[in-house]
């Protein structure tokens, strides 16, 4: 797993796989969560339940707004999303003399959408293929927001519905982006240099108790992100693409993946008898200058 890069979801810091992270900062609110490089995460807006938004269920799931976050670095990624009504289930059992009862469970019809990314040579292309299928209550007319993780502002932003380029307008704040509703043939773009992932208590419909909690003041600042919102369209009719020129998503603190031929092996490996207990064996060795960690292979 060493060549694989993993990205801390909450900070954007990148790590190489195949290692143990010691002294990892994980306060009470933070579940250690790492995203594999080139992963794609489709989602809906934040909600409290899977039921549709109504006057009495204001914090339900609004399926008319889809959000797709891309964690591209270099290379390609792909993810197929399956969506259904979230409630249909049918079990038709059959009997087999040798086996017994056989369950045949169906969750009804569904819609599938393939999302993909390709980043190479300073250009990244993100694609939402035309959705396939249907289910009861499905509406393919949706707005789409692409979120691309980056480490610098891209040089160019090109958004397309099918083969038609959209008129992309840049806004100057996250609030302006969130409030924008692009018209047909339009898209809205915002580069957020230091996004704050903590939205708790900031919604217009938040309760007074939620607004008054001290956690609201906690900043969860992550790496820069590019936000592009497409106008509402029939997502089953054509693919949607976003191309970023001058794309880069690299962590300057990420150690180079190369072997140091001049690094010496530790000497004087020992297990002092006076430090051995019934449940542990303490190992000691000589310090190696330039070493950042030591790996031990234990046989037995």
At which residue positions do the language-model features occur?
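Non-cytosolic beta-sheet module surface loops
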Residues: 148-150, 286-289, 298
């Amino acid at each position: 797993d060493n060549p694989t890069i993993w990205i801390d979801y909450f900070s954007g810091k990148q790590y190489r796989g195949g290692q143990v992270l010691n002294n990892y900062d994980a306060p009470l609110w933070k579940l250690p969560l790492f995203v594999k490089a080139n992963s794609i995460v489709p989602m809906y807006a934040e909600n409290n339940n899977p039921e549709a938004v109504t006057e009495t269920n204001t914090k339900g799931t609004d399926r008319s707004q889809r959000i797709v976050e891309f964690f591209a670095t270099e290379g390609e990624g792909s993810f197929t999303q399956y969506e259904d009504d979230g409630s249909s289930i049918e079990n038709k059992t059959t009997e087999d003399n040798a086996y017994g009862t056989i369950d045949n469970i169906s969750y009804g019809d569904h819609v599938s959408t393939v999302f993909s990314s390709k980043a190479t040579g300073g250009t990244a292309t993100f694609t939402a293929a035309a959705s396939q299928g249907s289910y009861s209550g499905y509406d393919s007319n949706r707005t789409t927001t692409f979120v691309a993780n980056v480490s610098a502002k891209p040089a160019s932003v090109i958004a397309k519905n099918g083969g038609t380029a959209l008129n992309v307008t840049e806004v100057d704040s996250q609030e302006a982006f969130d409030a924008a509703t692009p018209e047909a043939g339009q898209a809205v773009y915002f580069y957020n240099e230091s996004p704050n992932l903590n939205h708790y208590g900031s919604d217009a419909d938040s309760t007074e108790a939620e607004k008054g909690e001290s956690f609201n003041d906690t900043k969860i600042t992550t790496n820069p992100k590019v936000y592009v919102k497409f106008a509402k369209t029939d997502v089953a009719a054509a693919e949607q693409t976003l191309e970023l020129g001058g794309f880069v998503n690299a962590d300057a603190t990420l150690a180079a993946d190369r072997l140091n031929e001049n690094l010496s092996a530790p000497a004087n490996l020992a297990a002092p008898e006076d430090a051995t207990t019934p449940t542990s064996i303490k190992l000691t060795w000589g310090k190696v200058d330039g070493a950042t960690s030591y790996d031990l292979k234990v046989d037995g």
